[in-house]
Amino acid sequence: MKVWMWICLAGLAAGVTLLLCRSTAETQPTDKPSADNTEKPASASPSFTDPAKLTEKAPETFKAQFDTTRGKFTIEVTRSLSPNGADRFYNLVRSGYFTDIAFFRVVPGFMCQFGIHGDPNVSAKWREAPIPDDPVKGSNARGTITFATAGPNTRTAQLFINFGDNTGLDGQGFSPFGKVTEGMDVVDKIYGGYGDAPQFGGHGPDQGRIQMEGNPYLKKDFPNLDYIKSATIVSADGSK
């Protein structure tokens, strides 16, 4: 199913979606199962401001631990499931990209989405660094993690974790590369009270404004959102 996503690349104006100063159709996870104070974004570490330098091949298996405002959860990645996706995720985690990143789109029973950086300058760089698609080898079962897309070969830094068995996404090119193996109860508690994005009948954040304004917009207008505090690689190929 097509969805509309906004990410304005030049002169950001007025899910996951792209707005190149126009709205574009995106193949997004949208097949839902039936039935603070304003602040400046923290300055970005050079380690994640240059995507071209973050291309290290991921271990065949590794675990990443996420510390969030709801608690901790661990994702186990199997590179063979989605090599390009696993490599991108590995580099995002090890660079510190996920510090203070919001779960900005949370649809109970469906999925929670994250990955737009709190600094618009950083987001802009990653939008211009897509990775090639991977064949879908796994299913979007409960607890799996998958990159959002804006069409063929457009995966960048936005991801989602499936709350349910969303097998309908498998035929749409969403290629899971890992799964939550510890702390799925934490993931289930991520705040979803705002519902989906406005264009889908919810009251959640507008992705175009996140891209333009970053975390200050989210923390001012959506104070109940949960955030990733940090993410770290905790094991690779089974060794600490």
What are these regions (language model features)?
Residues 2-240:
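Cyclophilin-like peptidyl-prolyl cis-trans isomerases
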